[in-house]
Amino acid sequence: MAQLSALRLRGHPLAALFDEVAAPALHQIGEAWQRDRLSVAEEHVGSQAVIDAVARAQPLAEPPGEPVRPDRGVAVVAAVGSEQHDIAARMSACLLRAQGFEVLAPLAQTPAHDLAELVLRSRAALVALSSTMGNDHDESLRLAAAAARQTGGRVVVGGEGMRKARLPDEVRFLASLRDLDAEAQTAGRRRVRS
């Protein structure tokens, strides 16, 4: 994971690094744990190494002098339902901050009603939800989509747990963090109010 910062400093796009370095590392850790080649403690240590690398990548993601952009607005990022895996949500938050969004990230195990209330109160322009293994996200998706409709925002989802989900019509499945990066470039407020 140390290579993540070095590659970013060489100009590699952060979304590509997350897709090509961090995500495969997480898959290897998860598969090794499922096959009993890693203990729970070892799986947690490996996952924490990825979390630390994502945290270190944040300053490298943000363009100098371009903090939150008023044309972007707020993005809410969470791992839905009982989902305990929030590393993809952390990577998503990092990318969205780099795109100029003010990011509110409750991350893991965010209850559906609390998530919807946060979307409404923050007037979120973009809601990015992830699920690695969970399957109890129908209520979160339904409520987040309803809240986003009221704020004029978009809802995007990703992760293996979302592949089988019944998505409301206005919710878009994204297969990669590159897709999120591209989606974020067109999301947000359409004009700045003075």
Which positions does each model-derived feature cover?
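A general structural motif
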Residues: 81, 85-87, 106-113
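Conserved hydrophobic helix-helix packing surfaces used for dimerization/oligomerization
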Residues: 73-75
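Long amphipathic alpha-helical segments
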Residues: 1-67
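Short helix-loop-beta junction
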Residues: 90-104
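Short phosphate-binding/catalytic loops that engage adenosine nucleotides
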Residues: 12, 100-102, 152
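Cofactor-cradling patches in redox/metallo enzymes
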Residues: 95-97, 110-167
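Peripheral docking tails and interdomain loops at the edges
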Residues: 159-194
